[in-house]
Amino acid sequence: HHSNYVPWHFLRKSKNIKIKFAEINEDGDIPIENIEKEITEKTKVIAITHLSNVTGAVLPIKEITQLAHSKGIVVVVDGCQGGPHLKLDMQDLDCDFYAISCHKMYGPTGLGVLYGKKKWLEQLPPYQGGGGMINEVKKDRISYGDLPNKYEAGTMATAQVIAFNESIKFLESIGIENVIKHEKELIEYGQEILKKNNSVKLIGNPKERGGVLSFTVEGVHPHDIATILDETGVAIRAGHHCCQILHDKLG
């Protein structure tokens, strides 16, 4: 996803870091051996999605983290799709960072959640300066506040935080197990229907699939399909899904 790739691209420009890509297989999964073969003694970070918003693949974050940590590598997880669609246990996953987008959990826009292990959050410098994130300010020195205030510069988006709390309550009232069960039923039904049409090509057949089912229709532009379905009251996402590199790979 561009949100995971573009920041690293910025660092490639400013810090001259090297970015490598682990290849997907024909099912849309990233086998752990494909990740392992890209690792060298210089590898510092593995940044990876938990649930692909293109193929629907749920990646084995726990196993990937175990591999990474055995080699002293930090694991950063894009959990924007995983947050609302998977049962999460950070202690079990053991990743170093996990990022969530609140609006994908029925919350407000412009707000996100970053889980990070305390040892890293204490070591890393603030990414932004302002009021609220400092402990003491003198002419010649500044000391930063304790966690999490160290990373909360400026006026907090209080209304959005309160709204997101209500979103969490809403999801908890449904139960993540019920969400997963319902999505599984919808995906299986969708696959059953779409496979009957020879003009439809399903994208990806991952070992473990989240609530995403992607497809193309032979001879019809995706935006036209989206428009036609919209007229019947069905909303779908058409385009490159903010994943142009993956779309290029899939053809």
Annotate each predicted stretch with a short phrase.
Residues 1-251:
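Pyridoxal 5′-phosphate
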